[in-house]
Amino acid sequence: MNQTRTSAADRLTILVIAALLCAIGIIVPIISPIKIRLDPMSFTLGSHIAVFIAMFVSPVVALCVELGTTLGFVLAGFPPVIVLRALVQVFFVVVGAIWLQKKPETLNRWVSMSLFVLVTGLLHGVAEALVSTWFYFGGSIDQSKGFFVTIVLLVGVGTLAHHAVDFALSVLIWKPVEKIVRVPVSVRLNWKKK
């Protein structure tokens, strides 16, 4: 009986965490003071933090927060190419969240964490580049800089860099927060001091 209450309480807590992360994911694109737009690329510092933290909690929470974050880009009035780029992040989010759920120790070792960031960042960059390519060849993206600069460098490599920065910020935020989160989560950081 007590276990059922605890389980229900955990579910409620996880629901509240998901809702708060969705709210953060929605509001960041709207109010972030650090937005750099080099169409079709946009760098909104912190726009992936809620999603990464949700990935640390569970795949379901990550998926919900990713969709909520996409809504934030719609509400912020970003153009369709940027909104669709936000939507295709679902691929790296689901893969990354399942990875962390199956291998929760991933972020506790430098090599496995670097591999995680690289693989999810590449998925992220490729998915966004594919969406942008569709708009590029459809004529709705300025082609004056050429495909390589516009799609490969700005979107592909730019997304990978943005992914890595937001991931690092997410881990720095998660480290103290995880100590007060008392529900089952996919990731607990156990960094050893030398």
For the regions a protein language model found, what residue spans apply to each?
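Loop-helix junctions at membrane interfaces
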Residues: 1-194
